[in-house]
Amino acid sequence: AIAAAIPARHVVGCVVHVSWALQAPGAVQHHFGNKLILGEPSGQQTERAKALAALLKRAGFEAPLSEQIQRDTWYKLWGNMTVNPVSALTGATTDLILDDPLVRDFISQVMREAKEIGARIGIPIDQQPEDRHAVTRKLGAFKTSMLQDVEAGKPVELDALVTVVQELGVLTAVPTPFTDALLGLARLQARVKGLY
């Protein structure tokens, strides 16, 4: 419905590096972060992207322009596609997820699958899962957005975070047994709770 209403030529990509929580209707609590990475799908530094970045900077955001917004999007997804559903399944904050060696190894396997998919679609990631875990570790003990949604009884964004990667695995002929297991477990939990 959105794609029909807004043609792709009117879209500027944005990767959000901010943590908020909805406390009540109209009341949002800011936890950390202030970065909104902007970029045209073409990678060009257009006037509209520059104007949008300037507007966001005046509003107090860090708003860098990216020449590779697809890579920035994939990199964020690469971390979120694991810790979000695992936190939703377990109720654990990110520090507890990374502290458990079996869980950390499992999510690393999922990330290796996604890394291979990224390479096949032209969005290589030059890091290893442990490098990304170090980034997540710096954020401290926090509840992911998916865990917050489960606790609030809201639908989970499983398709945007995990299903899409599993589908890309099929399209690129990358085996995804770990991603499949994560998707199956998270989807079943969400269905049982009426959140998917």
Regions found by a protein language model. Give the residues of each.
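Active-site-proximal catalytic alpha-helix in oxidoreductases
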Residues: 70-98, 102-115, 141
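Rossmann-like NAD(P)(H) cofactor-binding subdomain of soluble oxidoreductases
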Residues: 1-27
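Short, hinge-like loop/turn segments at secondary-structure boundaries
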Residues: 28-32, 81-83, 195-196
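NAD(P)-dependent Rossmann-like dehydrogenase/reductase catalytic/cofactor-binding core
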Residues: 47, 96, 108-196
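Generic beta-strand structural signal
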Residues: 9-16, 34-36, 59-61
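FAD/FMN-dependent oxidoreductases across multiple families
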Residues: 46-84, 130-131
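Short beta-strand and adjoining strand-loop segment in the mid-core
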Residues: 26-53
